[in-house]
């Protein structure tokens, strides 16, 4: 940590997949962390935070809600930096405009107002999404920070997770406008699909997509058809690195590996032969070009990625197995002609929340 780095920061969405790992890394570095969650009294959802090393002395939980103006004021007061990760996620929402899109936009604007009111916040780091960049009819070979998704195209297609892509795009653009003219440095980090080990108790929404070849969740194949990936730990290290870098500004793509669905299927099939992995995908071409997200801007600052694609999936699969979120094999279920139902049945019998997470991405923030 730099000598003049702030000691106190706020992390929104701290109980989630990315947020909890970021809190862990911040505590390790000696930061005092104000972590916002929906309900600090719900031990089932915050126990993993309270059990972190240094949590007793350096972690405080705050109740906050993106839909309630001013609910982040108290948590942000006295902080020098804010990491905004909280976001509504429910890919099966019946009212995405009011349940996903509006709360995401209004939430980031409310947090910016809380930062201004605090008068202590110097930097706001916003966790954006690859969906703000490549939501376009014709995929480019390489994307960088200058690209933005075509919302008209997304609205017309309404592909899996479309409301998440729209909400993140509009929220990031609104944040850039709202932070002009104040003394708060605003940075957005654009992760691709986040994969790796985790400390939350339920199936992370990101892994619903990443492990869809194992679970047979075909609705998510379109997302990994020409996929880009980053390890959870690399992403959290990137957040802290850019926060501590006084020269950091603008948007930063954080992505270390690219793979088509065919390449990913081969990697998983070779490394974990106990899982049935499809090799043919109706409607998806056999020969697919790689679509890459360039992290050149980030790497040019001196940041280094530590993990490869196999590391990401090993961490994710091992953790899911340890927590009872994935069976150790699906070959038997496939032989019996019941691959997908077998996996879903296994998860449901272990925890109803896990089933909810696998099938529709739980409403918890990332």
From Swiss-Prot:
One Pfam family, short name: Epimerase
Domain of life: Eukaryota
Record has Oxidoreductase as a keyword: yes
Catalytic reaction list: a (2R,3S,4S)-leucoanthocyanidin + NADP(+) = a (2R,3R)-dihydroflavonol + NADPH + H(+); (2S)-flavan-4-ol + NADP(+) = (2S)-flavanone + NADPH + H(+)
Binding positions (NADP(+)): 45, 164
GO molecular function per UniProt: dihydrokaempferol 4-reductase activity; flavanone 4-reductase activity
Pathway: Pigment biosynthesis; anthocyanin biosynthesis
Keyword Metal-binding belongs to the record: no
Signal peptide (residue range): none
Keywords: Flavonoid biosynthesis, NADP, Oxidoreductase
EC assignment: 1.1.1.219, 1.1.1.234
InterPro entries per UniProt: Epimerase_deHydtase, NAD(P)-bd_dom_sf, NAD(P)_dehydrat-like
Record GO biological process: anthocyanin-containing compound biosynthetic process
Annotated family: Belongs to the NAD(P)-dependent epimerase/dehydratase family. Dihydroflavonol-4-reductase subfamily.
Record function comment: Bifunctional enzyme involved in flavonoid metabolism.
Entries under PANTHER family matching the protein: NAD DEPENDENT EPIMERASE/DEHYDRATASE, STEROL-4-ALPHA-CARBOXYLATE 3-DEHYDROGENASE, DECARBOXYLATING
Record-given protein name: Dihydroflavonol 4-reductase
Organism: Gerbera hybrida
């Amino acid at each position: 940590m730099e000598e003049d780095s702030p000691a106190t920061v706020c992390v929104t969405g701290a109980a989630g997949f990315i947020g909890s790992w970021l809190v862990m890394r911040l505590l390790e570095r000696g930061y005092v962390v104000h972590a916002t969650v929906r309900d600090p009294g719900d031990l089932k959802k915050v126990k993993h935070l309270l059990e972190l090393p240094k949590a007793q002395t350096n972690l405080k939980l705050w109740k906050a809600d993106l839909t309630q103006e001013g609910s982040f004021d108290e948590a942000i007061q006295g902080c020098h930096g804010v990491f905004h990760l909280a976001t509504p996620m429910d890919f099966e929402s019946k009212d995405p405009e009011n349940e996903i899109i509006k709360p995401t936009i209004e939430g980031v604007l409310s947090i910016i107002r809380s930062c201004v009111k605090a008068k202590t916040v110097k930097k706001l780091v916003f966790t954006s999404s690859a969906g703000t960049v490549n939501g376009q009819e014709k995929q480019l070979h390489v994307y960088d920070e200058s690209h933005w998704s075509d919302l008209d195209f997304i609205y017309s297609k309404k592909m899996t997770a479309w409301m998440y892509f729209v909400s993140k795009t509009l929220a990031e653009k609104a944040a850039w406008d709202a932070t002009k003219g104040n003394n708060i440095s605003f940075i957005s980090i654009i992760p691709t699909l986040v994969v790796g080990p985790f400390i939350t108790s339920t199936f992370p929404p990101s892994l619903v997509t990443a492990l869809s070849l194992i679970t047979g969740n075909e609705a998510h194949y379109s997302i990994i058809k020409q996929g880009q990936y980053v390890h959870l730990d690399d992403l959290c290290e990137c957040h802290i690195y850019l926060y501590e870098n006084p020269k950091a500004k603008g948007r930063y793509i954080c992505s270390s590996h690219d793979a088509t669905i065919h390449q990913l299927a081969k990697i998983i099939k070779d490394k974990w032969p106990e899982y049935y992995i499809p090799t043919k995908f109706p409607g998806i071409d056999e020969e697919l070009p790689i679509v890459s997200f360039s992290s050149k801007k980030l790497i040019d600052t001196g940041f280094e990625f530590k993990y490869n694609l196999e590391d990401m999936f090993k961490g994710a699969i091992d953790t899911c197995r340890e927590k009872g979120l994935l069976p150790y094999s699906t070959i038997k279920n496939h032989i019996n002609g019941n691959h997908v139902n077998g996996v879903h049945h296994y998860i449901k019998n272990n925890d109803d929340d896990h089933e909810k997470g696998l099938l529709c991405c739980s409403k918890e923030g990332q």
